Amino acid sequence: MQTIDKFNFAGKKAFVRVDFNVPLDENFNITDDTRMRAALPTLKKILADGGSIIIGSHLGRPKGVADKFSLKHIIKHLSELLGVEVQFANDCMGEEAAVKAAALQPGEVLLLENLRFYAEEEGKPRGLAEDATDEEKAAAKKAVKESQKEFTKKLASYADCYVNDAFGTAHRAHASTALIAKYFDTDNKMFGYLMEKEVKAVDKVLNDIQRPFTAIMGGSKVSSKIEIIENLLNKVDNLIIAGGMTYTFTKAMGGKIGISICEDDKLDLALDLIKKAKEKGVNLVLAVDAKIADAFSNDANTQFCAVDEIPDGWEGLDIGPKTEEIFANVIKESKTILWNGPTGVFEFENFTHGSRTVGEAIVEATKNGAFSLVGGGDSVACVNKFGLASGVSYVSTGGGALLEAIEGKVLPGIAAINE
């Protein structure tokens, strides 16, 4: 398999798929440029070799052309980060993109407009009537799949080689993340540095396990984490359940949870997971106490109580001090750690203490030789907020992609390079 380190980009044009899906404020200023910075090593290596770059990315989830999702808003900052004046094409498919790509000289960079302005990027039909028949839907899908081939071929035609550095979209079989790779032979397609690091980190957590292995799963819904939890039960020694999922498990075991978030239709599922953990010899660690509030608000009245004795009208919004200690002790004794999802309602300052404690325990374990992988939107926000990111082994940029990889799924963006 080709690697970016071995490849010489001198005199070559590289199509680089990045994930510049960055948050913008109402004045189109970038509020967090982490994803842009993450791609810099790859982009700078190509330029240092004497290559030129055509950058493809998406921004948001537009259903067509929309100014607020235009990548033109990030050109100035990207130019500053790269130290090169980045050119911009107002399209991906039209004459402007083709002409500018053809004219690129070594050391130059061209940013294409948002790939998702085109239905062909995702390969899903747009603009169907709500009452469209199954036949109409099928015809529209067939049509977009056909035009997707032309779209992909056109993108590939701009470049001599292809670099995928967008782990955040690796779980999507989109035109620019997977299908395009077919137009380049094995020697001319490769992962960027970020993608390489992500793939190695996931591989280490799943296949090169130093024990004890502890996974901390937060988040509000058991239903969205079920496949991950089931896959992890075959791998981990300890599985810590945190966040809103706690109360579904607590209620399933007969506890009183007040008005805490709960998936009533998943109580049997929670019991089944408890049973499976027992059968596999996995230590399933659940909260014993909670920080509860009389309203879903940062300013609500709060108290601590046993997690299964929450009074009516109150809801659990974070773990309590006894649980913090239990979780921290398990984490500190671990040698491989995966953290996905905070322990409480992280958006409210008064309910971040549990997440901070977990983060600090992970940093301590890492100092003592553990490998720690933090991934999935909110847990990444946690370690960044508390200044702990530098103390863990790896912070993943991919939310959904990371979770699907941990579920054991083959990611199309990775498979396309390996083929």
Curated annotation (Swiss-Prot):
Keywords attached to this entry: ATP-binding, Cytoplasm, Glycolysis, Kinase, Nucleotide-binding, Transferase
Documented EC number(s): 2.7.2.3
Organism domain of life: Bacteria
Localization of this protein: Cytoplasm
GO biological process, one term: glycolytic process
PANTHER family in the record: PHOSPHOGLYCERATE KINASE, PHOSPHOGLYCERATE KINASE 1, CHLOROPLASTIC-RELATED
HAMAP family in the cross-refs: Phosphoglyc_kinase
Protein name according to UniProt: Phosphoglycerate kinase
Species this protein is from: Bacteroides thetaiotaomicron (strain ATCC 29148 / DSM 2079 / JCM 5827 / CCUG 10774 / NCTC 10582 / VPI-5482 / E50)
